[in-house]
Amino acid sequence: MAKQSKNRVKLNKQYKSIGKIPVSALKKISEFMDLPALARDIRSSENNMVKHNHRHIDELEEQLKQLGITKEGYAEFVAKNYNQIRLGNKPLSLILAVLLENINHIAAVHLHYDKRENFWLVTTVHAIKPRNLEKIPLIWKR
């Protein structure tokens, strides 16, 4: 058992906490998936984002460089400013989106719930077109 505890501490060090999901949103999310009541923490890891979906990141990274923003900074911006939560395309996954007026693309991050560690992990960062976002089921809105 002690060995498992050491692994957990080591695992958590690689993730940075970048936001929280409101309790009101968790109530809505629980209508779509079975989650513990305290599954609010959103965490990020550069290695994890690259591992899960390098195509989106490569496309976005050049644009972000021009703006002087890192991938991690982009994920953190979305995690702190999202105004919609949509259902992800995989089990236990969500999309956080920042919708602003008069914009052609929407800042978005994909999250996956880690049951073992009880947090939401950013798996992908990207910009999505409004018409594509509208096709994804809306769970919660500010």
PLM feature spans:
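Ribonuclease/tRNase effector modules and their secretory precursors
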Residues: M1-R142
